[in-house]
Amino acid sequence: MKTNVDTDKFKIYSIDFFEREALSDDLFLVSVKMVNRDDRAFSQTYYLNGLEPTDLDDVSFDAPKYETTAGIDPGTIDPEEIAAQIARAKTMLPEGHTFKSVGNYTIEEAVPSDNDYLNRGKEFGGRTASFVVRFTEDGKETESSAGKTSYIYYEAQVTVGEDGQLSIEAK
């Protein structure tokens, strides 16, 4: 990502890391939202398996301003800190449940929307992090019928507070 985004032209305001498929715990792609000096917002996806990045796509609801967007420097993302957050989240799961994967991990800067209603009460410039944990209930991981098996899992949204504390909420 550091080599793909020209930070002289763009400021990144959102980074999403996604797993390949549910419960795979296999990092597959990174999606980035960024703003250029003309205040146009774009998104682009980078695949970790060697596929070419996607074309730049216009972002429809975001209306960031280049000058007032602080931007997220990919070089400041600390994988060890993220791993520690995930480890702490595992301990917050209900008893009798087992962690399986992180569905996505998001780091974003609050930017204006082009819809005034969505801007109400919003403070711009703050950075947040959140992620989705996927987990199963022990002994009830699958259900089968007619020779087909489905994996049964649950999701919870974990929010990282400014103080580093985690809160978790069922999705």
What label would you give each PLM region?
Residues 72, 76, 104, 126-127, ...:
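Intrinsically disordered, low-complexity regions
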Residues 53-106:
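Long, charged/polar, surface-exposed segments that mediate recognition or autoinhibition
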Residues 3:
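Cationic-aromatic interfacial patches
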Residues 38-63, 140-171:
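A short, surface-exposed beta-strand/turn
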Residues 22, 41, 63, 70, ...:
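A sequence-composition feature that detects small, non-aromatic residues
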Residues 6-45, 109-151:
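Exposed beta-strand-loop-beta-strand "reactive/processing" segments of non-cytosolic proteins
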